[in-house]
């Protein structure tokens, strides 16, 4: 029977399945951070259980670390306790930890791929909703809750029901300057923020194949923002070239054997999906969210929509509420909306290609008066590479703040946050009310678009910036 990529990955990991029971899956990789793991380790300790496979468990600190100092005390008592607990737990249970002083420390979904922890064909879990990022490699990756974190630590397995399948095909070639972030925001604009609920999404089409691995990670990272369980891109030569030579990747003949298997991880001809969505890449322009969920998104050259234009009463009410929170009036051009802060970072857009794109706009320009702009690399290696390329100097000379790695202003768990009423052009993944700080107003954009907003003081079309 013809199978989708998701069905192949799921079936390959079933340990046990009985009639009327949820299947038990084997988990190949478990990524751990300081926020969702303390209670899980406490549960192991209370029952006298070890970590079943410490060699398949990798930990880092990211959510509430300071981006200004490596001092564990910098972000308050709760953050300090969580980080100290992670140090203690990893030492006690034999788990590898990339702590604040480790050169590989960084956002968990940046660290995993760049160290070769993430590989095609794997099941990967983490107590974090954006674990879908790793699906870019053709891995089945999804976020889990703290009780499930404990279950995986104890058994290296997890009970999971089968999801529905969705194919999202982006046909044709994207125009110059259109990034993976624009593509995924356009997709969510079409599906809505709940359009993928109950599904695992496979992204395909020429525009997806054209993306680098970093672009594919941005794409899969935001699958969760359309309600999907996970996002997938089938592995190809782009994937294999990225993985080759990385720290935890197979070497020599083992790598060749792995690639032979990875090449089978494609949706079979004739396989059927429960839902199919199609977009034309050439129709996608730079995207900016205007509301309080990622599906409330328009082209940078559009006007703020009028709630009355929505036929669905639920959408209309949501738009009215969003505009009131965002302090926006219907009909005004998006390019006239001024911003207070810019955040370039997060597990969505903090990799080297993202920083290069932002630096290209920042080079030779200055951050607009009254705007605070932060650039937060996703990991120690990203920061080191950016500095080797001189990107930090470009940003600093333009008036951006060059920070240490961490999740930062994406979710405001450290000291990087918006004040009430402040408006931010952000490369992160969520624009919910209060996400970047109580009363803060978040607009999601690509790194180049964020840099353009920083130097102009308002939203601007990067295609017009020469």
UniProtKB/Swiss-Prot annotation:
Annotated metabolic or biological route of this protein: Amino-acid biosynthesis; L-leucine biosynthesis; L-leucine from 3-methyl-2-oxobutanoate: step 2/4
Cofactor(s) for this UniProt protein: [4Fe-4S] cluster
Superkingdom, taxonomy of origin: Bacteria
Reaction it catalyzes: (2R,3S)-3-isopropylmalate = (2S)-2-isopropylmalate
Database matches in Pfam families: Aconitase (PF00330)
Residue numbers binding [4Fe-4S] cluster: 347, 407, 410
Enzyme class: lyase
The record's free-text note on cofactor binding: Binds 1 [4Fe-4S] cluster per subunit.
GO molecular function, one term: metal ion binding
Enzyme Commission code: 4.2.1.33
Keyword terms, alphabetized: 4Fe-4S, Amino-acid biosynthesis, Branched-chain amino acid biosynthesis, Iron, Iron-sulfur, Leucine biosynthesis, Lyase, Metal-binding
GO biological process, one term: L-leucine biosynthetic process
Subunit structure as annotated in this protein's UniProt entry: Heterodimer of LeuC and LeuD.
Family from the record: Belongs to the aconitase/IPM isomerase family. LeuC type 1 subfamily.
HAMAP family referenced in this protein's UniProt entry, alphabetically: LeuC_type1
Function: Catalyzes the isomerization between 2-isopropylmalate and 3-isopropylmalate, via the formation of 2-isopropylmaleate.
Protein name (record): 3-isopropylmalate dehydratase large subunit
């Amino acid at each position: 029977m013809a199978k989708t990529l998701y069905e192949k990955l799921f079936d390959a990991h079933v340990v046990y399945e009985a009639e009327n029971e949820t299947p038990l899956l084997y988990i190949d990789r478990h990524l751990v951070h300081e926020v969702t793991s303390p209670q899980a380790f406490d549960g192991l300790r209370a029952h006298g259980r070890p970590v079943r496979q410490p060699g398949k468990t990798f930990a880092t600190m990211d959510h509430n670390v300071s981006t200004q100092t490596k001092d564990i005390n910098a972000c308050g008592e709760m953050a300090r306790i969580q980080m100290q607990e992670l140090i203690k737990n990893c030492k006690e249970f034999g788990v590898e930890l990339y702590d604040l002083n480790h050169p590989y420390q960084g956002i968990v979904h940046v660290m995993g791929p760049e160290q070769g922890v993430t590989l095609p064909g794997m099941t990967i879990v983490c107590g974090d909703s954006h674990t879908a990022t790793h699906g870019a490699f053709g891995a089945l990756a999804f976020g889990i809750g703290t009780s499930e974190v404990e279950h995986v630590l104890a058994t290296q397995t997890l009970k999971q029901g089968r999801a529905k399948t969705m194919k999202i095909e982006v046909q044709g070639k994207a125009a110059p300057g259109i990034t993976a972030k624009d593509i995924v925001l356009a997709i969510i604009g079409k599906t809505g923020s709940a359009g993928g609920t109950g599904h695992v999404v496979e992204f395909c089409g020429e525009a997806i194949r054209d993306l680098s691995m970093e672009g594919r990670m941005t794409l899969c990272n935001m699958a969760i923002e359309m309600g999907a369980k996970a996002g997938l891109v089938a592995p190809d030569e782009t994937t294999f070239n990225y993985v080759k030579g990385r720290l935890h990747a197979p070497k020599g003949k083992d790598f060749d054997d792995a690639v032979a298997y990875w090449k089978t991880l494609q949706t079979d001809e004739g396989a059927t999906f429960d839902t199919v969505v199609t977009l034309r890449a050439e129709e996608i322009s730079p995207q900016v969210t205007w509301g309080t969920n990622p599906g409330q998104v328009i082209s940078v050259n559009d006007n703020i929509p009028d709630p009355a234009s929505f036929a669905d009463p639920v959408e209309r009410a949501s738009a009215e509420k969003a505009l009131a929170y965002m302090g926006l009036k219907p009909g005004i051009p998006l390019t006239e909306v001024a911003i207070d802060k810019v955040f370039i970072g997060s597990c969505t857009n903090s990799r080297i290609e993202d920083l290069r794109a932002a630096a290209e706009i920042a080079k030779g320009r200055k951050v607009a008066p009254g705007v605070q702009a932060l650039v937060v690399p996703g990991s120690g290696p990203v920061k080191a590479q950016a500095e080797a390329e001189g990107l930090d100097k470009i940003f600093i000379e333009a008036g951006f703040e060059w920070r240490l790695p961490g999740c930062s202003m994406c979710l405001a768990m450290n000291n990087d946050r918006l004040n009430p009423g402040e408006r931010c052009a952000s490369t992160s993944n969520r624009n919910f009310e209060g996400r970047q700080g109580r009363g803060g107003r978040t607009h999601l954009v690509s790194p180049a678009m964020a840099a353009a907003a920083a130097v102009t003081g308002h939203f601007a079309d990067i295609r017009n910036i020469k």
